[in-house]
């Protein structure tokens, strides 16, 4: 489980989420962020690339952050073109123009 929610978000109970995941034998990785940055993105990419963390369930409050990070993963790690990756990210729930801009900018950076 990769959780992008911050402790201060309405309805977020990080400790309960961690306990629920570990009780059923799942790894729990908390990568909290409101506004994305390169550090958070690199942490996510490392976590998702680690095969010991798979299968993986990724969540946030609305799927916007998940969609943005998934877009980046698809382009950077899976070699997808940006149009295909964005279509999938939008299907997942990416609607925020700010997050789309960040994700597009990130994948264009060498």
Question: Where do the model's predicted regions map?
Answer:
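Short, surface-exposed acidic-centric catalytic microdomains
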Residues: 1-27
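A phosphate-binding catalytic loop at a beta-strand-loop-alpha-helix junction
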Residues: 56-67
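Stable alpha-helical elements in mature extracytoplasmic
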Residues: 13, 17, 40, 44, ...
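Active-site-adjacent alpha-helix immediately C-terminal to a catalytic or transition-state-stabilizing loop
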Residues: 67-82
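Cysteine-dependent PTP/DSP-like catalytic domain, specifically the C-terminal lobe
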Residues: 79-110
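Short histidine/acidic/glycine/proline-rich micro-motifs that form metal-
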Residues: 5-10, 32-36, 74-76
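Sec/Tat-exported extracytoplasmic proteins
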Residues: 2-5, 48, 52, 73, ...
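Helix-loop module immediately N-terminal to the HCX5R catalytic loop
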Residues: 24-56
């Amino acid at each position: 489980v990769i959780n992008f929610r911050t402790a201060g978000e309405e309805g977020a109970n990080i400790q309960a989420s961690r306990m629920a995941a570990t009780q059923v034998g799942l790894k729990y990785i908390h990568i909290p962020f409101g506004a994305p940055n390169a550090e958070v993105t690199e942490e996510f990419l490392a976590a998702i690339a680690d095969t010991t963390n798979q299968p993986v369930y990724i969540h946030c409050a609305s799927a916007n952050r998940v969609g943005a990070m998934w877009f980046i993963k698809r382009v950077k790690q899976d070699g997808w073109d940006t149009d295909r990756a964005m279509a999938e990210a939008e299907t997942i729930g990416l609607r925020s123009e700010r997050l789309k801009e960040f994700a597009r900018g990130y994948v264009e950076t060498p």
